[in-house]
Amino acid sequence: MLKTTPLNAAHRGMHAKMVDFGGWDMPLHYGSQLDEHHAVRRDAGMFDVSHMLTVDLHGENVRQFLRGLVANNIDKLTVPGKALYTCMLNPAGGIIDDLIIYFLSESWFRLVVNAGTADKDIDWITLQSSQHAPDLTITPRRDLAMIAVQGPNARAKVWAVIPDSKAASEDLKPFQSVAFGNYFIARTGYTGEDGFEITLPADEAAAFWQKLHAAGVAPAGLGSRDTLRLEAGMNLYGQDMDETTNPLESGLAWTVDLKSERDFIGKQALLEKPVNQQLVGLVLLDKGVLRNHQKIITQHEGIAGEGEITSGGFSPTLNQSIALARIPVGIAAGEQVHVVVRDKQLAARVVKYPFVRNGQALI
């Protein structure tokens, strides 16, 4: 039996193509994945992300607990409402999950974790809490829904639906949030566009979704969500990284604090293990399409090497095939590699991602 979000009936009412997404019954598209992609890049689209799990941590020692739990430095969070993107690592430095942490008060931090890892994450956090912070209260919030409204006109359309929220949210900078009535409004997203991710009571989600639709926000499914995040150069857990890879070889070194004296789970392993691989962007030069798991052949300073595409596909904004790929270190942007597609080797150029940000091509 598939799990459903509070918006399941709304998706079906909009004739969504529904698919099994990690055990959840989720919309792939509502007719045209391409139109949904362009709506987000050019105007505003909305995604049901209620399958992701909000987890509230309460207790007097939450900050100290998180200092040891995650790789990024939780002490960057000094102003209530500020958010931090980070990885949670195992002792070997492998990525258990990537998540966002919101600082709400010294005794209340909010985590948003991926749907496919939610149970594993809760088990891990509970285990670590039992050892290091037994008084911590861990509350999974399945009573909440989350809707992401993304695009250059996204914020204005949210304000049209919740007029009173404008004063509270218009000065939010990226990775800041504010509570407004029953709404928790964060200026975050997974598309490379501006917008809000809005958390609200599950029983209010369907009415809010319909109001957004009436205000001209296009419903968008998992298909366009994936092409948008790929263009934005944003990692997808389970494809671009997992427990067998670490942040330093996954393009996430910027989320790891190795400079402070603070210790965290996985830090020692990261310090000891040489980094032999890197995550890069690829743009296909020959005719074809880049796909996940395709093999890459590299040549660098006379040494042959191999890599693999972690996320590949067609970019509607750029009108060409792009990918994220893990290849040997040392190969720089501008160099060429070859991708094995069936029995052919297709040329691709290594680029620095993101490929697209705020509607503009960056390559």
From Swiss-Prot:
S-S pairs: none
Superkingdom, natural source: Bacteria
Catalytic activities: N(6)-[(R)-S(8)-aminomethyldihydrolipoyl]-L-lysyl-[protein] + (6S)-5,6,7,8-tetrahydrofolate = N(6)-[(R)-dihydrolipoyl]-L-lysyl-[protein] + (6R)-5,10-methylene-5,6,7,8-tetrahydrofolate + NH4(+)
Pfam families referenced in this protein's UniProt entry, alphabetically: GCV_T, GCV_T_C
Keyword terms, alphabetized: Aminotransferase, Transferase
Gene Ontology, cellular component aspect: cytosol; glycine cleavage complex
GO molecular function: aminomethyltransferase activity; transaminase activity
EC number: 2.1.2.10
GO BP of this protein: glycine decarboxylation via glycine cleavage system
Stored NCBIfam families: gcvT, PRK00389.1
The family this protein is said to belong to: Belongs to the GcvT family.
Function: The glycine cleavage system catalyzes the degradation of glycine.
Assembly information from the UniProt record: The glycine cleavage system is composed of four proteins: P, T, L and H.
Protein name, entry field: Aminomethyltransferase
